[in-house]
Design a protein with these regions (language model features):
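Hydrophobic, aromatic-lined core segments that form the binding pocket/scaffold
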Residues: 3-193
Length: 193
């Protein structure tokens, strides 16, 4: 089924977790567009050459890194504000939210070199994030076997969590100059609630 194909794609270490998520969205939207014949489309996603072609298309889609960064920062600020209103996770969120607010004042101060350096600091945790995403997909994408739209909505929520976790890790890294396992764990635990 769909969840099995999602897990196959997410477990493929040939692709970064973020790239795998984009592939999953393409698959989910493709299945939604297929209408009542969507079940006939599922098997092609089990084919390794097809997945490679899909990954190449995702890689060359030309996403605007600056706009994506701004969106992640705004998402994080929204989540942080919601947690603040509830009085939750202040010890962790205060410094990360302050960093996000400072960045929001002038997005131009975040350079491509900063994002590349963060990608290097984050890379040791990609396997951890892949396991997290697999677990989320396994547990959250349980919907009705015939309800592709339900699974697509669940996948959107998982992607939002991933984006928030990764951005919180960026904020901590940017503020502290390093990304420890403990910091990464805090990002995952707090922002996946």
């Amino acid at each position: 089924g769909v969840r099995k194909r999602f897990l196959t794609i997410m477990s493929d270490r040939a692709y970064r977790p973020a790239q795998s998520l984009c592939m999953l969205f393409y698959m989910a939207l493709d299945l939604c567009d297929a209408g009542t014949s969507w079940k006939a489309e599922v098997p092609k996603y089990g084919d390794a050459p097809f997945r490679k072609e899909l990954a190449d298309a995702v890689e060359h889609a030309g996403a605007d890194c600056r706009a994506a960064f701004v969106e992640r920062n705004e998402l994080f600020l929204d989540l942080a504000e919601n947690y603040r209103k509830e009085g939750l996770y202040r010890a962790f969120l205060t410094s990360a939210a302050e960093e996000a607010e400072q960045i929001a004042e002038d997005y131009g101060k975040i350079r491509k070199e900063d994002l590349d350096a963060f990608a290097q600091a984050f890379s040791p945790y990609e396997a951890l994030m892949r396991c997290y995403l697999q677990s989320e997909i396994f547990s959250e994408c349980l919907g009705e076997p015939d309800d592709v739209e339900y699974v697509t909505v669940k996948l959107q929520w998982i992607a939002l969590e991933y984006a928030a976790i990764r951005h919180a890790a960026f904020l901590c890294w940017h503020r502290e100059g390093a990304l420890s396992y403990e910091t990464m764990r805090s990002c995952m635990v707090i922002l996946s609630r």
